[in-house]
Amino acid sequence: MALPSLLLVVAALAGGVRPPGARNLTLAVVLPEHNLSYAWAWPRVGPAVALAMEALGRALPVDLRFVSSELDGACSEYLAPLRAVDLKLYHDPDLLLGPGCVYPAASVARFASHWRLPLLTAGAVASGFSAKSEHYRTLVRTGPSAPKLGEFVVMLHGHFNWTARAALLYLDARTDDRPHYFTIEGVFEALQGSNLSVQHQVYAREPGGPEQATHFIRANGRIVYICGPLEMLHEILLQAQRENLTNGDYVFFYLDVFGESLRAGPTRSMGRPWQDNRTREQAQALREAFQTVLVITYREPPNPEYQEFQNRLLIRAREDFGVELAPSLMNLIAGCFYDGILLYAEVLNETIQEGGTREDGLRIVEKMQGRRYRGVTGLVVMDKNNDRETDFVLWAMGDLVSGDFQPAAHYSGAEKQIWWTGRPIPWVKGVPPLDNPPCAFDMDDPSCDKTPLSTLAIVALGTGITFIMFGVSSFLIFRKLMLEKELASMLWRIRWEELQFGNSERCHKGAGSRLTLSLRGSSYGSLMTAHGKYQIFANTGHFKGNVVAIKHVNKKRIELTRQVLFELKHMRDVQFNHLTRFIGACIDPPNICIVTEYCPRGSLQDILENDSINLDWMFRYSLINDLVKGMAFLHNSIIASHGSLKSSNCVVDSRFVLKITDYGLASFRSTAEPDDSHALYAKKLWTAPELLSGNPLPTTGMQKADVYSFGIILQEIALRSGPFYLEGLDLSPKEIVQKVRNGQRPYFRPSIDRTQLNEELVLLMERCWAQDPAERPDFGQIKGFIRRFNKEGGTSILDNLLLRMEQYANNLEKLVEERTQAYLEEKRKAEALLYQILPHSVAEQLKRGETVQAEAFDSVTIYFSDIVGFTALSAESTPMQVVTLLNDLYTCFDAIIDNFDVYKVETIGDAYMVVSGLPGRNGQRHAPEIARMALALLDAVSSFRIRHRPHDQLRLRIGVHTGPVCAGVVGLKMPRYCLFGDTVNTASRMESNGQALKIHVSSTTKDALDELGCFQLELRGDVEMKGKGKMRTYWLLGERKGPAGLL
């Protein structure tokens, strides 16, 4: 067969200009040119390489050029190193792609290791390449390999408890690349490494070969692995049928990694490897014999990217190579080459960014170890040996009527986990065969002695059996009587009068206590409002001194049938740390309710929707672990399934342990909401598609539906964005439920941010909400899966609890600090508002709860002012203009009086009243403080601008008087600090008898100002005052220039 050496040269350009000193990136491909029986033949892989180059061209500013140099050769370990040397000497490639054949790959890999040149292949499956010694240190296998098949087989043996023996049969002509030998080699080494007795034999393609094979099987093992052509398997099975080796004592694993036996052929239909061009009797014998056969194949990637890639691959193969390829598992190898090229480009780019060079092949290869990324073939995980983790499928005759083979299990190499589809394997005897049954291989065991028993031994044996049967029968009868007694006693029953509530409305079913997480916790149920918001309620009460949760049942009465009694008994029997304890039930109409353990921390839904609670991933994994443990126990209990699992049915107790509630008691369940209500559809967001269709399901189906609900809860915990979060879509619960129920491809599922979440967690979510229930894992598998990627899961229960409590305490401290700061800020605002209404000293007295007594002041100075012509101005202005005018004026005044030792008493309309000398006495400074303030206000008015009448001058009239007053707080609602006395009236008369833009002062004020000798006053004369007679008054003109004043 031809072995072309193809060179793909990629010239990297940055913005169309090559950097100085840069050179082309050379990729040398060494693969068979014409033999399509190889999955790595160039016509199969070439289109994938071209697609990879195009993908790199779209992602990077590169100029792609293909240069080929074809040399004739064979898939030979002798010619391959010669070709490798030629490529190195004449082209100096940066990466070798291939070979896929084992022997050529071994030779070329040794040279590549010496040159420190990366060698990337999706073939070379042999186990010897896994030991990355000095010979193969630059080899990277991005495709399947035999050791990974061995890992899968070892896990199968562990699952079926096969720990002793196995037999291997394979074809090895030694004239080709020995594909069957290298495939089964991985199984042999893995089983031998697990301390099993493993025997192997080459199948002889000659007369008597089938008889030799069955003789080898009888002598060496009940678990048989066969690797060879389908015709070889048919021959062995026909002979096994003749010798009665297909009676269920043996199982035959057929290693058909590319699934050729399951494809349709000239003489067989798809999925029926037993069909062949034989006689009717032989065909029937083969069909019966194949019931004992399990087929192992690679797993075709289920992601839509691979399907699209395969379609493009077939088109390019036809257009570029003139080859018609069919969809098959062989195309997986092309996809692995595609992902390998993109992996190399990604690592090379990182290496250069870190200061490395493309010539540093060892560094590039080391950076590929342990890498995880998503390619067209799904999740690509490289192990520490730079071998890709491989997925496999186990096929069994799932339909005994048609004889069709169907997937029984999927193996994930990345997770080291087997996912059983739920389709039972049709074991002939109903159970898997034993790998080392007694007296089958070890005849030296004394128990295998078949010497007949004596008459006395037979009598003794019969008597013993009779006594045993009598004892068992007595025990069963006693157990039956005790069961009936327990059912009749109704230990679960609670009288309504035994329940105590916090209020007297015992019969009021709507009396729920609204709870908050930071105080007492909240409910187990959620109600959706018309606006889509959740309101959480819990009905709680006391039973025998303990707080309990009470769930009312929307039924008029409960018939105590035998089924209902058994349901209640089972609820009492089921006790587990992660299930809420069932206390009892009240069936007294109309107060029918279920009483369970109360968990004060609230529901999981409450916690996730409370943004003030910080949940790190340790805490989240703890909650997930608790949920998985509870569901695993529930599924293995007599209750078997939940049926309504959702985050509101998961509650957290005082020790931060998550518990599952609202399980069991199917006879008590009823739907209170209308069929088309918003709340009803909101509760169905966690419901599996098969339940939404309304078809009744068996118990196993309900368990798979619980797994779907768990997947939705996982998404809630991961994103904390509510159930069934959809990025960029605003759909009602009804629309979401309808889309899920329709089941159209692509299946409608919540949004996932893969960049922010653990890839394994995302994979678990997707498997949990798979459309086909058989593809969903059970909770036992989920428990093992989470244990592997939860790094904190190994801590003790006490450590975990302490960590949870510490985190919760930190959250509470942070919450208290935030609330305290908010309280202090609001207190400051309230006090500031109070100080604006009342004097500071008076406000402090009121804050201390003291009574403010009226106080007399011997001498204070009072200021009054108003606007001349304000009535006429108001009549010519709108109310809003008047308000704006007064607001602007008094804002200006308030800013000015802050500079003086004065207290603003009040404003009424255009009147403005200020006093100095109270409530804090200031000696004789009250008169000059008011005088200076009045001068400042008069000066400000001269430049004040009226918005709606900018050309008008505002004319202020001011009156000032000094004398004794009495002051105190008046009223309870809107209390005011008021002044009383003749001095107030006199000051008002001084203002009303004054003149515009002048300050009118009394003689007492003039005398107080004269003591300072710095104020300029002018005698006005005697003025007639209403109620006062004639009073001598003065005009305050200003303050003389001096050290402390201005004129």
UniProtKB/Swiss-Prot annotation:
Keyword Disulfide bond found: yes
Main EC class the enzyme belongs to: lyase
Catalytic activity: GTP = 3',5'-cyclic GMP + diphosphate
Protein name from the UniProt record: Atrial natriuretic peptide receptor 2
An annotated Gene Ontology molecular function: identical protein binding
Residue ranges of domain Guanylate cyclase in the record: 861-991
Function description: Receptor for the C-type natriuretic peptide NPPC/CNP hormone. Has guanylate cyclase activity upon binding of its ligand. May play a role in the regulation of skeletal growth.
InterPro entries linked: A/G_cyclase, A/G_cyclase_CS, ANF_lig-bd_rcpt, ANPR/GUC, Cyclic_nucleotide_synthase, Kinase-like_dom_sf, Nucleotide_cyclase, Peripla_BP_I
